[in-house]
């Protein structure tokens, strides 16, 4: 019987069901040509994921049958977040129905939603004594509601177990199921609604096959219409070949659709089979874009090379009083 490595996410040890790399990306419309990667600049420094607190959080996730996007997507901030006892939880399994070539989450045929997951999640978060939590998911194009009912069930379980907890959700685009999904989430709303547009519209075909830029903007706007008291949040990764003018236009689009919170970070290639990094954006440009975003009226902006959607999400939400 195969023994799993406790330090590695279970999905990374079962390649027969969890496809990654070339096997995952073989059917995308724009083929990735592996090449020599750009050398990482000095400002991209990632700590190794070790230490007692990191091991404790990983062990807790394994024991509870839960997943974190920190591990599944190979986030560069894993050691920092796990080291402080925090994690961004990924619900609805660890297998995605899409094959986005920037993302390291596994592709395959997912299992049905686990009805016991919301309660296990609530118990784990209470055990960690978290005050702020981010819940995300894989894409579930196989489900009639895109997984929205499961998001709502998790929010209800969290509110019941930890009434003082603030909950941010980072959702997929609910392609073809937007109204059903929004009705479910409006009945059990989070404290922050996050959906990333990821990149500029020109790069969607190669970076987000199966997704639509305008639909992502519409999702943010429609949620705001249904639940006007809950702020919306979105983010982009830079370094895929976009221009600064294209990024500025995307920021204007987000503000035009009522988005209040923003994250901007550097794209990092998970493997040579993924989309290559076209450019490492210097910190000064992230600062410049942060200033531009604030001029547009974003209430909360996190913009730096290693910023990710949920990185210091509690601090970002506190700026607008969530």
Swiss-Prot record:
Native species: Methylococcus capsulatus (strain ATCC 33009 / NCIMB 11132 / Bath)
NCBIfam families noted in UniProt: lipA, PRK05481.1, PRK12928.1
EC assignment: 2.8.1.8
Pathway given in the UniProt record: Protein modification; protein lipoylation via endogenous pathway; protein N(6)-(lipoyl)lysine from octanoyl-[acyl-carrier-protein]: step 2/2
UniProt cross-references to SUPFAM superfamilies, sorted A to Z: Radical SAM enzymes (SSF102114)
Gene Ontology molecular functions: 4 iron, 4 sulfur cluster binding; lipoate synthase activity; metal ion binding
Family in the record: Belongs to the radical SAM superfamily. Lipoyl synthase family.
Residues binding [4Fe-4S] cluster 2: 96, 100, 103
Keyword Chaperone: no
Biased composition (Basic and acidic residues): 15-26
Keyword Iron-sulfur: yes
GO cellular component, one term: cytoplasm
Biased composition (Polar residues): 1-14
Cofactor binding: number and manner: Binds 2 [4Fe-4S] clusters per subunit. One cluster is coordinated with 3 cysteines and an exchangeable S-adenosyl-L-methionine.
Pfam families per UniProt: Radical_SAM (PF04055)
Binding site for [4Fe-4S] cluster 1: 70, 75, 81, 310
Catalysed reaction, written as an equation: [[Fe-S] cluster scaffold protein carrying a second [4Fe-4S](2+) cluster] + N(6)-octanoyl-L-lysyl-[protein] + 2 oxidized [2Fe-2S]-[ferredoxin] + 2 S-adenosyl-L-methionine + 4 H(+) = [[Fe-S] cluster scaffold protein] + N(6)-[(R)-dihydrolipoyl]-L-lysyl-[protein] + 4 Fe(3+) + 2 hydrogen sulfide + 2 5'-deoxyadenosine + 2 L-methionine + 2 reduced [2Fe-2S]-[ferredoxin]
Keywords annotated in UniProt: 4Fe-4S, Cytoplasm, Iron, Iron-sulfur, Metal-binding, S-adenosyl-L-methionine, Transferase
Cofactor(s) annotated in UniProt: [4Fe-4S] cluster
InterPro entries for this protein: Aldolase_TIM, Elp3/MiaA/NifB-like_rSAM, Lipoyl_synth, rSAM
Region span, Disordered: 1-30
Protein name: Lipoyl synthase
Subcellular location: Cytoplasm
């Amino acid at each position: 019987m195969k023994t799993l490595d406790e330090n590695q996410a279970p999905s990374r040890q079962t390649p027969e069901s969890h496809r990654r790399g070339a096997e995952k990306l073989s059917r995308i419309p724009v083929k990735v040509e592996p090449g020599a990667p750009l050398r990482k600049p000095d400002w991209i420094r990632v700590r190794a994921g070790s230490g007692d607190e990191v091991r404790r959080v990983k062990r807790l996730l394994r024991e509870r049958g839960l997943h974190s996007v920190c591990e599944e997507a190979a986030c560069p901030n894993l050691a920092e977040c796990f080291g402080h006892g925090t994690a961004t939880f990924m619900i609805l399994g660890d297998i995605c129905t899409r094959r986005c070539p920037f993302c390291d989450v596994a592709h395959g045929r997912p299992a049905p939603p686990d009805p016991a997951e919301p309660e296990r999640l609530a118990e784990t978060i209470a055990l960690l004594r978290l005050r702020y939590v981010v819940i995300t998911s894989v894409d579930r194009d196989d489900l009639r509601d895109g997984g929205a009912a499961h998001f709502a069930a998790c929010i209800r379980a969290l509110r019941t177990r930890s009434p003082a907890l603030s909950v941010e959700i980072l959702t997929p685009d609910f392609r073809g199921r937007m109204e059903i999904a929004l009705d479910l989430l409006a009945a059990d709303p989070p404290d922050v609604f996050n959906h990333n547009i990821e990149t500029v519209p020109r790069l969607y075909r190669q970076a987000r096959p199966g997704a639509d830029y305008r639909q992502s903007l519409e999702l943010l706007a429609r949620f705001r219409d249904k639940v006007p008291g809950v702020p919306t949040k979105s983010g982009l990764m830079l370094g895929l070949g976009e221009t600064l003018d294209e990024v500025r236009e995307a920021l204007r689009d987000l503000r035009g659709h009522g988005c209040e919170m923003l994250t901007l970070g550097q794209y990092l290639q998970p493997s040579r089979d993924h989309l290559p990094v076209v450019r490492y954006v210097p910190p000064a440009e992230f600062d410049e874009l942060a200033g531009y975003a604030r001029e547009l009226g974003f209430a909360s902006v996190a913009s730096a090379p290693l910023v990710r959607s949920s990185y210091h999400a509690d601090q970002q939400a506190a700026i607008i009083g969530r």
